[in-house]
């Protein structure tokens, strides 16, 4: 039985989406047990709607929950030992749960997870990895917003962790990895990116195949399985892609309603449009993974509906059942055993100061 703790209060729709999402998963994955954390008056009425969860879940009442507009430091100070998000994370630390999921405040989730679970000894810094729909299938992109800036060593860490996540989700022996850069030529880019590329190219780390630099317009093509960048660039790329997808949808909707013949054309092509909508649906690939921590923590989109939250639960299930943490720990250990040989002894320049978003 895989145990998953859920911050029921997180996200735009709260218990209505999170508990309903758990009920969807229960139909297909009966070997999952849920620990629901939330405020009594908000959770209990919703739980009554899903008797199918009665024997496969436990509700744990909390004093408060983390608001979406709270700063990470404020959320940590106010929520420690009180909020539904904190208790869901702490359940992983205490061994009561194998993974934690929240659709709540990203900064707060990152801060609480870092404070409660601590970093893997083998990892320098956490990263958030997201699943990105592409022309081929899906790619893993990281870091999409855990921290700003990265050294060459930290970028290699992200490559190792991202490849481990891709192997876990898609059962590919050696995922292809690319570093996001301003060009594909080896002479382009900041020092940290070029240095990380040199290391990945020369060392040939087990468990991944380095393909070189990729540009922003390559992400959606799916030319590599894993795209690695620091959190500032990654977050901008993510938000740009999401905004572009929404804009295309709005333009298409307006165009299809502009005339009788446009509407007729849509009617005749509706199968193709359904395929496009399914491919680009953010709920289908919902579930960012916080990598580098001593535990599995999944961040769902705050706007996710029940179906989207169910997708995030399935990601957590795959991470646990396929041993994500063991794979990443072993891969990082192999890299760091040779780290002194790979990097210059002087301090590495970083892309910037490594601030937290």
Curated annotation (Swiss-Prot):
The keyword Lipid metabolism applies. It catalyses: a fatty acyl-[ACP] + phosphate = an acyl phosphate + holo-[ACP]. Pathway: Lipid metabolism; phospholipid metabolism. GO terms for biological process: fatty acid biosynthetic process; phospholipid biosynthetic process. GO terms for molecular function: phosphate:acyl-[acyl carrier protein] acyltransferase activity. Keywords: Cytoplasm, Lipid biosynthesis, Lipid metabolism, Phospholipid biosynthesis, Phospholipid metabolism, Transferase. SUPFAM superfamilies: Isocitrate/Isopropylmalate dehydrogenase-like. It is found in: Cytoplasm. It is an enzyme of class 2 (transferase). It holds the Pfam family FA_synthesis. InterPro entries: FA_synthesis, Phospholipid_synth_PlsX-like. GO terms for cellular component: cytoplasm. Its EC number is 2.3.1.274. The keyword Lipid metabolism applies. NCBIfam families: plsX. Belongs to the PlsX family. Homodimer. Probably interacts with PlsY. Catalyzes the reversible formation of acyl-phosphate (acyl-PO(4)) from acyl-[acyl-carrier-protein] (acyl-ACP). This enzyme utilizes acyl-ACP as fatty acyl donor, but not acyl-CoA. This is Phosphate acyltransferase. It comes from Bartonella quintana (strain Toulouse) (Rochalimaea quintana).
């Amino acid at each position: 039985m895989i145990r998953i703790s859920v911050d029921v209060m997180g996200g735009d729709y709260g218990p209505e989406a999170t508990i309903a999402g758990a009920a969807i998963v229960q139909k297909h994955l009966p070997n999952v047990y849920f620990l629901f954390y939330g405020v009594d008056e908000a959770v209990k009425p919703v739980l009554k709607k899903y008797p199918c969860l009665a024997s496969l879940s436990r509700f744990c009442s909390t004093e408060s929950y983390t608001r979406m507009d709270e700063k990470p430091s404020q959320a940590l100070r106010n929520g420690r030992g009180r909020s539904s998000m904190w208790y869901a994370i702490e359940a992983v630390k205490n061994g009561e749960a194998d993974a934690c999921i929240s659709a709540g405040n990203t900064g707060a989730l990152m801060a609480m997870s870092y404070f409660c679970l601590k970093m893997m000894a083998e990892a320098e810094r956490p990263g958030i990895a997201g699943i990105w729909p592409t022309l081929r299938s899906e790619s893993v992109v990281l870091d999409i917003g855990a921290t700003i800036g990265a050294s060459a060593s930290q970028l290699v860490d992200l490559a190792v962790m991202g490849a481990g996540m891709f192997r876990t989700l898609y059962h590919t022996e050696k995922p292809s990895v690319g570093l996001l850069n301003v060009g594909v030529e080896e002479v382009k880019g900041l020092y940290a990116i070029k240095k990380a590329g040199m290391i990945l190219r020369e060392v040939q780390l087990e468990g991944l195949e380095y393909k070189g630099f990729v540009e922003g317009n390559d992400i959606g093509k799916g030319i590599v399985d894993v795209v690695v960048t620091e959190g500032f660039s990654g977050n901008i790329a993510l938000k740009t892609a999401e905004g572009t997808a929404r804009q295309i949808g709005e333009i298409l909707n307006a165009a299809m309603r502009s005339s009788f013949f446009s509407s007729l054309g849509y009617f005749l092509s509706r199968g193709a449009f359904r395929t496009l909508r399914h491919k680009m649906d953010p709920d289908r690939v919902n579930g960012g993974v916080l990598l580098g921590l001593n535990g599995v923590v999944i961040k769902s989109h705050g706007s996710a509906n029940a179906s989207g939250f169910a997708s995030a639960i399935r990601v957590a299930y795959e991470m646990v059942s396929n041993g994500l943490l063991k794979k990443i720990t072993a891969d990082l250990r192999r890299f760091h055993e040779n780290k002194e040989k790979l990097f210059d002894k002087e301090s590495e320049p970083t892309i910037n100061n490594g601030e937290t978003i």
